[in-house]
Amino acid sequence: MKPIEILKELIKFRSLTPSDDGAFNYVSMLLADFSEDRFELNGVTNAIFTKRLGLGPHLCFAGHIDVVPPGEGWASDPFMPVEADGFLYGRGAQDMKSGIAAAICALAAARDFKGTLSLLLTSDEEGDGIYGTREMLSKLREQGALPDFAVVAEPTCEVRFGDTIKIGRRGSINGVLTLTGIGGHAAYPDKCINPVHILAPVLASLAGHDLDAGSEDFAPAKIVITDIRGGSQVVNVTPKDVCVMFNVRGGVGLGLEDVRDYVLGSFELDAKDALCSESESCGKLEMSCTAQLRAGASLHLALKSSSKPFLTQRNSKIVQKLSASVQKICGAAAELNTAGGTSDARYFAEFGVETAEFGVRNDTIHQINERVEISDVENLAKIFSDLIENFG
Protein backbone atom coordinates (compact mmCIF):
# COMPACT_ATOMS: atom_id res chain seq x y z
CA MET A 1 0.00 0.00 0.00
CA LYS A 2 1.73 3.18 -1.22
CA PRO A 3 0.69 6.55 0.22
CA ILE A 4 0.84 8.36 -3.11
CA GLU A 5 -1.60 5.89 -4.68
CA ILE A 6 -3.97 6.35 -1.75
CA LEU A 7 -3.65 10.12 -2.14
CA LYS A 8 -4.54 9.93 -5.82
CA GLU A 9 -7.75 8.09 -5.00
CA LEU A 10 -8.64 10.51 -2.19
CA ILE A 11 -8.21 13.52 -4.48
CA LYS A 12 -10.77 12.04 -6.89
CA PHE A 13 -13.52 12.45 -4.29
CA ARG A 14 -15.17 15.87 -4.68
CA SER A 15 -15.38 16.28 -0.93
CA LEU A 16 -16.35 19.94 -0.83
CA THR A 17 -17.09 20.84 2.77
CA PRO A 18 -19.15 19.42 4.44
CA SER A 19 -19.42 16.43 2.06
CA ASP A 20 -17.13 13.41 2.07
CA ASP A 21 -18.44 12.34 -1.37
CA GLY A 22 -17.96 8.68 -0.46
CA ALA A 23 -14.33 9.02 0.65
CA PHE A 24 -15.09 7.45 4.01
CA ASN A 25 -16.19 4.26 2.28
CA TYR A 26 -12.82 4.12 0.52
CA VAL A 27 -10.97 4.59 3.82
CA SER A 28 -13.12 1.88 5.37
CA MET A 29 -12.04 -0.52 2.64
CA LEU A 30 -8.36 0.27 3.22
CA LEU A 31 -8.66 -0.21 6.98
CA ALA A 32 -10.85 -3.29 6.79
CA ASP A 33 -9.34 -4.84 9.94
CA PHE A 34 -10.13 -1.72 11.99
CA SER A 35 -13.48 -1.32 13.72
CA GLU A 36 -15.43 1.68 12.45
CA ASP A 37 -17.77 4.05 14.23
CA ARG A 38 -19.42 6.47 11.83
CA PHE A 39 -21.41 9.42 13.10
CA GLU A 40 -23.52 11.74 10.94
CA LEU A 41 -25.00 15.01 12.15
CA ASN A 42 -26.62 17.83 10.15
CA GLY A 43 -25.04 16.78 6.87
CA VAL A 44 -21.59 16.22 8.40
CA THR A 45 -19.93 12.81 8.45
CA ASN A 46 -17.43 11.86 11.15
CA ALA A 47 -15.76 8.50 11.61
CA ILE A 48 -13.17 6.84 13.79
CA PHE A 49 -11.37 3.67 12.73
CA THR A 50 -9.91 1.80 15.71
CA LYS A 51 -7.66 -1.21 16.26
CA ARG A 52 -6.67 -2.49 19.68
CA LEU A 53 -3.32 -4.26 19.68
CA GLY A 54 -2.56 -4.21 23.40
CA LEU A 55 -3.25 -2.62 26.76
CA GLY A 56 -1.00 0.40 26.22
CA PRO A 57 -1.89 3.99 25.27
CA HIS A 58 -4.34 5.03 22.58
CA LEU A 59 -2.57 6.91 19.76
CA CYS A 60 -4.88 8.65 17.31
CA PHE A 61 -4.13 10.17 13.91
CA ALA A 62 -6.65 12.77 12.79
CA GLY A 63 -7.63 14.99 9.91
CA HIS A 64 -10.36 16.33 7.67
CA ILE A 65 -11.44 14.86 4.36
CA ASP A 66 -13.26 18.00 3.22
CA VAL A 67 -11.68 20.62 0.97
CA VAL A 68 -12.41 24.20 -0.05
CA PRO A 69 -13.90 24.92 -3.51
CA PRO A 70 -11.20 24.78 -6.19
CA GLY A 71 -12.04 28.04 -7.94
CA GLU A 72 -11.27 28.85 -11.56
CA GLY A 73 -8.00 28.84 -13.45
CA TRP A 74 -6.62 25.36 -12.84
CA ALA A 75 -4.32 23.87 -15.46
CA SER A 76 -6.19 20.56 -15.08
CA ASP A 77 -9.27 19.11 -13.40
CA PRO A 78 -8.67 19.74 -9.65
CA PHE A 79 -10.30 16.41 -8.81
CA MET A 80 -8.29 14.35 -11.28
CA PRO A 81 -4.78 14.00 -9.81
CA VAL A 82 -1.95 14.84 -12.19
CA GLU A 83 1.64 13.75 -11.58
CA ALA A 84 4.35 15.99 -13.04
CA ASP A 85 7.98 16.83 -12.22
CA GLY A 86 7.90 15.06 -8.86
CA PHE A 87 4.67 16.71 -7.73
CA LEU A 88 1.06 15.57 -7.50
CA TYR A 89 -1.54 18.21 -8.39
CA GLY A 90 -5.13 18.29 -7.14
CA ARG A 91 -7.42 19.94 -4.61
CA GLY A 92 -6.52 18.64 -1.17
CA ALA A 93 -3.06 17.47 -2.22
CA GLN A 94 -1.53 19.42 0.67
CA ASP A 95 -4.58 20.31 2.75
CA MET A 96 -4.91 17.66 3.85
CA LYS A 97 -5.49 14.44 1.97
CA SER A 98 -1.74 13.80 1.88
CA GLY A 99 -1.69 13.61 5.68
CA ILE A 100 -4.63 11.23 5.68
CA ALA A 101 -3.02 9.02 3.02
CA ALA A 102 0.22 8.83 5.01
CA ALA A 103 -1.63 7.99 8.22
CA ILE A 104 -3.66 5.26 6.52
CA CYS A 105 -0.51 3.73 5.10
CA ALA A 106 1.24 3.74 8.49
CA LEU A 107 -1.79 2.42 10.37
CA ALA A 108 -2.46 -0.39 7.91
CA ALA A 109 1.14 -1.60 8.24
CA ALA A 110 1.30 -1.43 12.06
CA ARG A 111 1.72 -4.78 13.79
CA ASP A 112 3.73 -4.45 17.00
CA PHE A 113 2.08 -1.47 18.69
CA LYS A 114 1.22 -2.30 22.31
CA GLY A 115 -1.87 -0.17 22.64
CA THR A 116 -4.75 1.17 20.54
CA LEU A 117 -4.38 2.88 17.17
CA SER A 118 -7.05 4.97 15.51
CA LEU A 119 -7.82 7.37 12.68
CA LEU A 120 -10.41 10.09 13.32
CA LEU A 121 -11.81 11.89 10.28
CA THR A 122 -14.38 14.61 9.72
CA SER A 123 -15.96 16.27 6.70
CA ASP A 124 -16.51 19.55 8.57
CA GLU A 125 -13.26 21.45 9.12
CA GLU A 126 -13.01 23.86 6.21
CA GLY A 127 -16.56 25.10 6.79
CA ASP A 128 -18.28 26.02 10.04
CA GLY A 129 -16.63 23.19 11.95
CA ILE A 130 -19.56 22.98 14.36
CA TYR A 131 -20.55 19.34 13.86
CA GLY A 132 -17.15 17.82 13.17
CA THR A 133 -14.22 16.81 15.34
CA ARG A 134 -15.55 18.39 18.54
CA GLU A 135 -18.81 16.47 18.30
CA MET A 136 -16.96 13.23 17.59
CA LEU A 137 -14.68 13.71 20.59
CA SER A 138 -17.70 14.45 22.77
CA LYS A 139 -19.21 11.16 21.65
CA LEU A 140 -15.97 9.30 22.37
CA ARG A 141 -15.85 10.84 25.85
CA GLU A 142 -19.34 9.53 26.54
CA GLN A 143 -18.11 6.08 25.51
CA GLY A 144 -14.95 6.34 27.61
CA ALA A 145 -12.94 5.95 24.41
CA LEU A 146 -11.00 9.21 24.11
CA PRO A 147 -7.43 8.79 22.82
CA ASP A 148 -4.48 9.55 25.07
CA PHE A 149 -2.38 11.14 22.32
CA ALA A 150 -3.15 12.58 18.90
CA VAL A 151 -1.28 13.63 15.78
CA VAL A 152 -3.28 15.94 13.51
CA ALA A 153 -1.76 15.57 10.03
CA GLU A 154 -2.26 19.18 8.92
CA PRO A 155 0.32 20.65 6.49
CA THR A 156 2.64 22.31 9.00
CA CYS A 157 5.95 22.63 7.15
CA GLU A 158 7.05 25.97 5.71
CA VAL A 159 10.23 25.92 3.61
CA ARG A 160 11.35 22.30 3.64
CA PHE A 161 9.56 19.13 4.61
CA GLY A 162 10.20 18.36 8.26
CA ASP A 163 10.95 21.90 9.40
CA THR A 164 7.91 22.51 11.64
CA ILE A 165 5.86 20.69 14.25
CA LYS A 166 2.93 22.60 15.72
CA ILE A 167 2.66 22.14 19.48
CA GLY A 168 -0.18 24.60 19.91
CA ARG A 169 -2.25 27.24 18.22
CA ARG A 170 -3.21 30.77 19.09
CA GLY A 171 -6.84 31.41 19.87
CA SER A 172 -8.90 33.71 17.67
CA ILE A 173 -11.14 36.52 18.92
CA ASN A 174 -13.27 38.45 16.43
CA GLY A 175 -14.49 41.93 17.29
CA VAL A 176 -16.96 44.44 15.87
CA LEU A 177 -16.83 47.98 17.27
CA THR A 178 -19.67 50.32 16.30
CA LEU A 179 -19.89 54.02 17.15
CA THR A 180 -23.25 55.67 16.56
CA GLY A 181 -23.78 59.42 16.44
CA ILE A 182 -26.04 61.80 14.52
CA GLY A 183 -25.67 62.20 10.79
CA GLY A 184 -26.36 65.45 9.00
CA HIS A 185 -25.23 68.07 6.51
CA ALA A 186 -21.46 68.48 6.24
CA ALA A 187 -21.90 72.28 6.20
CA TYR A 188 -23.37 72.18 9.73
CA PRO A 189 -20.99 69.91 11.71
CA ASP A 190 -22.06 71.53 14.99
CA LYS A 191 -25.52 70.02 14.49
CA CYS A 192 -24.08 66.51 14.03
CA ILE A 193 -22.22 63.98 16.14
CA ASN A 194 -19.69 62.54 13.72
CA PRO A 195 -18.57 59.06 14.86
CA VAL A 196 -15.65 59.07 12.42
CA HIS A 197 -14.21 62.13 14.15
CA ILE A 198 -14.58 60.35 17.49
CA LEU A 199 -12.90 57.22 16.16
CA ALA A 200 -10.02 58.94 14.36
CA PRO A 201 -7.84 59.89 17.36
CA VAL A 202 -8.43 56.47 18.94
CA LEU A 203 -7.74 54.36 15.87
CA ALA A 204 -3.97 54.65 16.14
CA SER A 205 -4.08 53.16 19.64
CA LEU A 206 -6.10 50.19 18.38
CA ALA A 207 -4.48 49.30 15.06
CA GLY A 208 -1.61 46.88 15.49
CA HIS A 209 -1.53 47.20 19.26
CA ASP A 210 0.05 44.33 21.19
CA LEU A 211 -2.22 43.30 24.04
CA ASP A 212 0.57 41.34 25.73
CA ALA A 213 4.29 40.71 25.39
CA GLY A 214 3.93 37.18 24.10
CA SER A 215 5.96 34.26 25.45
CA GLU A 216 8.43 31.59 24.42
CA ASP A 217 5.60 29.75 22.70
CA PHE A 218 3.26 32.50 21.52
CA ALA A 219 3.80 35.72 19.60
CA PRO A 220 2.28 38.88 21.14
CA ALA A 221 -1.50 39.13 20.81
CA LYS A 222 -2.08 41.91 18.28
CA ILE A 223 -5.23 43.81 17.33
CA VAL A 224 -5.48 43.52 13.55
CA ILE A 225 -8.01 45.82 11.87
CA THR A 226 -9.77 43.98 9.05
CA ASP A 227 -12.46 46.42 7.93
CA ILE A 228 -13.67 50.00 8.53
CA ARG A 229 -16.82 51.41 7.01
CA GLY A 230 -19.27 54.21 7.63
CA GLY A 231 -21.40 56.79 5.86
CA SER A 232 -23.27 56.61 2.57
CA GLN A 233 -20.43 57.61 0.21
CA VAL A 234 -21.91 61.08 -0.23
CA VAL A 235 -19.47 63.98 0.19
CA ASN A 236 -21.84 66.41 1.91
CA VAL A 237 -23.48 64.07 4.45
CA THR A 238 -21.78 63.11 7.71
CA PRO A 239 -22.17 59.48 8.79
CA LYS A 240 -24.50 58.30 11.50
CA ASP A 241 -22.26 55.42 12.46
CA VAL A 242 -18.89 53.84 11.79
CA CYS A 243 -18.02 50.16 12.17
CA VAL A 244 -14.58 48.67 12.79
CA MET A 245 -13.98 44.95 12.45
CA PHE A 246 -10.86 43.38 13.94
CA ASN A 247 -9.25 40.09 14.87
CA VAL A 248 -6.94 39.15 17.73
CA ARG A 249 -4.79 36.01 17.74
CA GLY A 250 -3.53 35.29 21.25
CA GLY A 251 -1.99 32.60 23.39
CA VAL A 252 -3.17 30.83 26.50
CA GLY A 253 -4.42 33.33 29.08
CA LEU A 254 -5.84 35.99 26.76
CA GLY A 255 -9.60 36.32 27.17
CA LEU A 256 -12.51 38.41 25.94
CA GLU A 257 -12.20 40.57 29.06
CA ASP A 258 -8.65 41.59 28.11
CA VAL A 259 -9.76 42.76 24.67
CA ARG A 260 -12.84 44.50 26.09
CA ASP A 261 -10.85 46.36 28.72
CA TYR A 262 -8.30 47.66 26.24
CA VAL A 263 -10.86 48.79 23.66
CA LEU A 264 -13.00 50.54 26.26
CA GLY A 265 -9.90 52.07 27.81
CA SER A 266 -8.99 53.60 24.46
CA PHE A 267 -12.18 55.64 24.78
CA GLU A 268 -11.42 56.51 28.43
CA LEU A 269 -13.98 54.00 29.67
CA ASP A 270 -13.69 50.93 31.86
CA ALA A 271 -15.89 47.89 32.37
CA LYS A 272 -18.09 49.57 34.99
CA ASP A 273 -18.99 52.26 32.44
CA ALA A 274 -20.45 49.68 30.07
CA LEU A 275 -23.37 47.29 30.16
CA CYS A 276 -21.94 43.90 29.20
CA SER A 277 -23.42 40.43 28.79
CA GLU A 278 -21.86 37.06 28.00
CA SER A 279 -23.14 33.91 26.35
CA GLU A 280 -21.82 30.61 25.04
CA SER A 281 -22.79 28.57 21.98
CA CYS A 282 -21.11 25.36 20.79
CA GLY A 283 -18.23 26.04 23.14
CA LYS A 284 -17.63 29.54 21.76
CA LEU A 285 -17.83 32.51 24.14
CA GLU A 286 -19.48 35.77 23.10
CA MET A 287 -19.60 39.17 24.79
CA SER A 288 -21.69 42.25 24.02
CA CYS A 289 -21.06 45.69 25.58
CA THR A 290 -22.79 49.05 25.19
CA ALA A 291 -21.72 52.42 26.60
CA GLN A 292 -22.26 56.14 26.16
CA LEU A 293 -19.32 58.33 25.18
CA ARG A 294 -18.74 61.83 26.52
CA ALA A 295 -18.95 63.18 22.99
CA GLY A 296 -22.59 62.11 22.85
CA ALA A 297 -22.18 59.05 20.67
CA SER A 298 -22.92 55.49 21.74
CA LEU A 299 -20.51 52.58 21.59
CA HIS A 300 -21.28 48.93 20.97
CA LEU A 301 -18.62 46.24 21.15
CA ALA A 302 -19.30 42.64 20.11
CA LEU A 303 -16.61 40.02 20.78
CA LYS A 304 -16.60 36.34 19.88
CA SER A 305 -14.02 33.72 20.70
CA SER A 306 -14.08 31.68 17.50
CA SER A 307 -11.38 29.30 18.74
CA LYS A 308 -9.52 28.68 21.97
CA PRO A 309 -5.73 28.62 22.20
CA PHE A 310 -3.91 25.50 23.30
CA LEU A 311 -0.36 24.45 24.07
CA THR A 312 1.17 21.00 24.42
CA GLN A 313 4.27 21.04 26.57
CA ARG A 314 7.57 20.62 24.75
CA ASN A 315 8.56 17.72 27.01
CA SER A 316 5.32 15.81 26.46
CA LYS A 317 5.56 12.28 25.10
CA ILE A 318 3.82 13.02 21.81
CA VAL A 319 6.07 16.00 21.04
CA GLN A 320 9.26 14.19 22.00
CA LYS A 321 8.46 11.01 20.08
CA LEU A 322 7.24 12.84 16.98
CA SER A 323 10.30 15.10 17.02
CA ALA A 324 12.57 12.05 17.19
CA SER A 325 10.83 10.43 14.21
CA VAL A 326 11.08 13.61 12.13
CA GLN A 327 14.77 13.94 12.98
CA LYS A 328 15.38 10.30 12.06
CA ILE A 329 13.66 10.41 8.65
CA CYS A 330 14.51 13.99 7.63
CA GLY A 331 17.97 14.24 9.14
CA ALA A 332 17.26 17.59 10.80
CA ALA A 333 15.36 18.80 13.85
CA ALA A 334 11.92 20.35 13.46
CA GLU A 335 11.10 23.72 14.99
CA LEU A 336 8.33 23.60 17.58
CA ASN A 337 5.96 26.55 17.22
CA THR A 338 2.38 27.78 17.45
CA ALA A 339 2.22 30.12 14.45
CA GLY A 340 -0.51 30.17 11.82
CA GLY A 341 -4.26 29.85 11.92
CA THR A 342 -6.54 27.52 13.84
CA SER A 343 -7.08 23.80 13.35
CA ASP A 344 -9.05 20.94 14.85
CA ALA A 345 -6.10 20.14 17.09
CA ARG A 346 -7.58 22.62 19.56
CA TYR A 347 -10.53 20.29 20.12
CA PHE A 348 -8.29 17.39 21.11
CA ALA A 349 -6.56 19.68 23.61
CA GLU A 350 -9.94 20.81 24.94
CA PHE A 351 -10.75 17.17 25.75
CA GLY A 352 -7.44 16.63 27.52
CA VAL A 353 -5.68 14.77 24.69
CA GLU A 354 -1.96 15.53 24.30
CA THR A 355 -1.74 16.74 20.71
CA ALA A 356 0.81 17.75 18.09
CA GLU A 357 0.43 18.59 14.41
CA PHE A 358 2.70 17.53 11.59
CA GLY A 359 2.32 17.15 7.84
CA VAL A 360 3.62 18.22 4.45
CA ARG A 361 4.46 21.75 3.33
CA ASN A 362 1.69 24.35 3.11
CA ASP A 363 2.90 26.66 0.33
CA THR A 364 -0.04 26.00 -2.04
CA ILE A 365 -2.94 25.29 0.32
CA HIS A 366 -6.30 26.73 -0.84
CA GLN A 367 -4.64 27.94 -4.07
CA ILE A 368 -5.30 27.03 -7.68
CA ASN A 369 -3.01 24.25 -8.90
CA GLU A 370 -2.49 23.02 -5.34
CA ARG A 371 0.31 20.48 -5.33
CA VAL A 372 2.40 18.32 -3.02
CA GLU A 373 5.88 16.93 -3.53
CA ILE A 374 5.59 13.16 -3.87
CA SER A 375 8.69 12.48 -1.79
CA ASP A 376 7.18 14.51 1.07
CA VAL A 377 4.14 12.23 1.17
CA GLU A 378 6.33 9.14 1.13
CA ASN A 379 8.51 10.48 3.94
CA LEU A 380 5.46 11.52 5.96
CA ALA A 381 4.24 7.91 5.89
CA LYS A 382 7.70 6.78 7.05
CA ILE A 383 7.62 9.26 9.93
CA PHE A 384 4.19 8.10 11.05
CA SER A 385 5.30 4.45 10.84
CA ASP A 386 8.41 5.21 12.88
CA LEU A 387 6.31 7.05 15.45
CA ILE A 388 4.02 4.05 15.85
CA GLU A 389 6.94 1.63 16.05
CA ASN A 390 8.79 3.60 18.72
CA PHE A 391 5.92 5.08 20.72
CA GLY A 392 5.79 2.49 23.47
Name each model feature, range by range.
Residues 59-121, 376:
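Active-site metal-coordination/substrate-binding segment of hydrolases
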Residues 311-325:
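Short, low-order "capping/linker" segments at domain edges
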Residues 139-270, 284-289, 293-302, 307:
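Midchain, well-structured core segments that form catalytic/ion-binding scaffolds
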Residues 100-168:
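Acidic/histidine-rich catalytic neighborhood of metal-dependent amide-processing enzymes
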Residues 84-86, 106-119, 142-146, 206-215, ...:
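Phosphate-handling active-site elements
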Residues 277, 302, 306, 323-392:
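Zn-dependent metallopeptidase/amidohydrolase metal-coordination segment
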Residues 68-84, 151, 168-178, 356:
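Acidic-glycine-rich active-site phosphate/pyrophosphate-binding loop
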Residues 1-71, 241-247, 259-262, 321, ...:
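N-terminal helical capping/dimerization or prosegment-like subdomains
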